């Protein structure tokens, strides 16, 4: 037990494996399952939770059996992606815990389980509020704060974003203070935070909690790998692309061994990063076969638009954003649909369809008002500003300044740079000197982010305004970031197929990068490239 509390999962595993040889008790099996979970041996951990459940049933410890069943449900469903198995374990936990009756703390867990599978948001909210009250009445923080975290998610999904996020903050504060004891609850609360922050682009909140909880996450090895896919998405929005790539690749690599549902979520976010970087071929390769995944729409639509396939992007976005154009938005519309509407405005503008672009921008503005979040309001202002620029009507500068302030407050550097570029376009005839200054700022931001496609657009605008810009390779190296990565891996002795597997790109793409880097460095073959790496002490 001490090893588990100290976060030494390996020592705890050894101790409980020895104890298991002497007694097949529910407690020993459950503790071993916890140690395996902390080592991220999820399949084996789930199997031991299932064995712990059976042992507790034999020992007539129903509360403990329900706890083991809930842990098995969390792993099989939320980590391994087997939703039918998850539903079975949730149903089993609910049946067992219902035997205790409504006057016991176990009823709080029953309500949480019911809420988890309840499709109606209002009913779900009622169940969770009842569970919170039970947790407080019986002094059970695991019930109270897990229900509170889930309630926060319900509020976010029903457009009460700030209220919901504050409930998530409270749950995490209790978690960091050590009030919760159940391992699955800890991961559920962390994952809920990352999911919500990614959904509403709340970069500052996620960043603050990652710092505040750093000791807990490091010591206990909590936060499942698939939760880190959400965090990778947040880092992408924050412009911290190298960190995002590390998180997303680690999450994808962890699930390489057959857990495809969770691997795919990380791969889709990696593809979205590639689109932002302008590495469109790699993004397309990553998304091949994932076109029906529920998370794919933003990345796939953005890829279509970037490749000049506006009709494909329009068809995809129109199908998933159908809803009311009335004065009162549908419940949940701002949280789920808002970001897609912003992308749809870009598509209509690309096609020259100003009427539909204005209609969707106005719809986006209405639902942004319902959410009260800085990101969506800024996105709505940017959309209206772009419509004004394209149509030559209205006051685009006012909208774009609003967008600039909102994106800066939300700490979204890519969106700040995009807005500066639009502001430069808006001012190009009236105030060319100011337009040049804004375009130069945008270009510097895009170059810092390594957003090649957008940097090219900023450079083209500057040239059209008669402003000199730097051309050619920057610094002493002529290699792109991806070419440098390929060069480093050549130095480790990897073959082209192995490099492709490591970087999630095709063999043909690897061959292209190898040819380019050899030409740029004046090398004749891979052997000379490997020698170059060794001579210059280049490490991956």
Residue ranges of predicted features:
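Tandem amphipathic alpha-helical repeat scaffolds
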Residues: 1, 5, 30-41, 66-82, ...
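TPR-repeat structural position
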Residues: 9, 42, 62, 82-83, ...
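Single-residue signature of alpha-solenoid repeat helices
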Residues: 12, 45, 85-86, 124, ...
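Amphipathic alpha-helical segments of tetratricopeptide repeats
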Residues: 17-21, 50-61, 74, 91-99, ...
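Residue signature of alpha-solenoid helical repeat architecture, marking inter-repeat boundaries
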Residues: 23-26, 30, 59, 63, ...
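Residues within the DNA-recognition helix of helix-turn-helix
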Residues: 48, 438, 513-516
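Generic long, charged, amphipathic alpha-helical segments
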Residues: 356-422, 465-476, 498
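Helix-turn-helix DNA-binding segment
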Residues: 411, 460-463, 469-515, 519-524, ...
């Amino acid at each position: 037990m001490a090893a588990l509390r100290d976060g030494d999962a390996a020592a705890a595993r050894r101790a409980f494996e020895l104890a298991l040889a002497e007694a097949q008790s529910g407690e020993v099996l459950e503790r071993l399952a916890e140690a395996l979970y902390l080592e991220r041996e999820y399949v084996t951990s789930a199997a031991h939770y299932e064995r712990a459940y059976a042992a507790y049933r034999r020992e007539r410890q129903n509360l403990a059996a329900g706890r083991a069943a809930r842990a098995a449900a969390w792993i099989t469903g939320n980590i391994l992606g087997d939703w039918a198995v998850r539903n079975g374990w949730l149903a089993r936990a609910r049946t067992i815990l219902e035997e205790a009756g409504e006057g016991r703390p176990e009823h709080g867990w029953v309500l949480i389980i019911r809420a988890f599978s309840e499709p109606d948001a209002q009913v779900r909210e009622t169940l969770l509020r009842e569970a919170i009250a039970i947790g407080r009445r019986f002094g059970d923080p695991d019930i109270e704060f897990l229900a509170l975290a889930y309630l926060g998610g319900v509020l976010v999904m029903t457009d009460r974003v700030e209220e919901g996020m504050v409930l998530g903050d409270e749950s995490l504060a209790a978690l960091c203070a050590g009030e919760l004891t159940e391992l699955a609850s800890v991961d559920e609360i962390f994952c809920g935070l990352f999911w919500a922050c990614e959904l509403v682009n709340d970069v500052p909140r996620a960043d603050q909690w990652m710092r505040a909880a750093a000791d807990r996450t490091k010591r206990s090895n909590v936060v499942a790998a698939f939760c880190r896919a959400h965090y990778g998405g947040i880092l992408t929005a924050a412009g911290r692309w190298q960190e995002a790539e590390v998180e997303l690749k680690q999450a994808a690599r962890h699930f390489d061994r057959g857990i495809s549902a969770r691997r795919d979520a990380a791969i889709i976010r990696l593809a979205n990063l590639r689109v932002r970087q302008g590495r469109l071929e790699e993004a397309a390769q990553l998304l091949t076969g994932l076109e029906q995944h529920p998370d794919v729409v933003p990345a796939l639509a953005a890829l279509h638009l970037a490749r000049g396939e506006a009709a494909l992007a329009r068809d995809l976005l129109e199908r998933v954003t159908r809803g009311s154009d009335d004065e009162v938005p549908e419940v949940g519309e701002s949280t789920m649909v808002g970001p897609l509407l912003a992308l749809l405005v870009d598509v209509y503008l690309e096609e020259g369809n100003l009427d539909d672009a204005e209609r969707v921008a106005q719809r986006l503005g209405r639902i942004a008002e319902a959410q009260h979040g800085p990101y969506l309001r800024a996105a709505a202002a940017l959309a209206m500003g772009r419509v004004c620029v394209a149509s030559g009507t209205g006051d685009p500068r006012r909208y774009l300044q609003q967008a600039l302030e909102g994106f800066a407050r939300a700490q979204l550097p890519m969106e700040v740079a995009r807005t500066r570029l639009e502001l430069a376009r808006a001012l190009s005839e009236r105030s060319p000197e100011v337009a040049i200054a804004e375009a130069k700022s945008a270009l510097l931001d895009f170059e810092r982010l390594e957003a090649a496609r957008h940097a090219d657009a900023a450079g083209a605008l500057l040239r059209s305004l008669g402003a000199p810009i730097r051309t050619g390779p920057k610094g002493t190296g002529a290699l792109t970031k991806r070419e440098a990565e390929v060069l480093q891996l050549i130095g480790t002795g990897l073959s082209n197929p192995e490099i492709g597997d490591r970087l999630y790109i095709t063999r043909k793409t690897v061959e292209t990068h190898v040819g380019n880097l050899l030409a740029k460095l004046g090398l004749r073959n891979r052997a000379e490239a490997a020698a170059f790496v060794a001579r210059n002490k280049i490490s991956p």
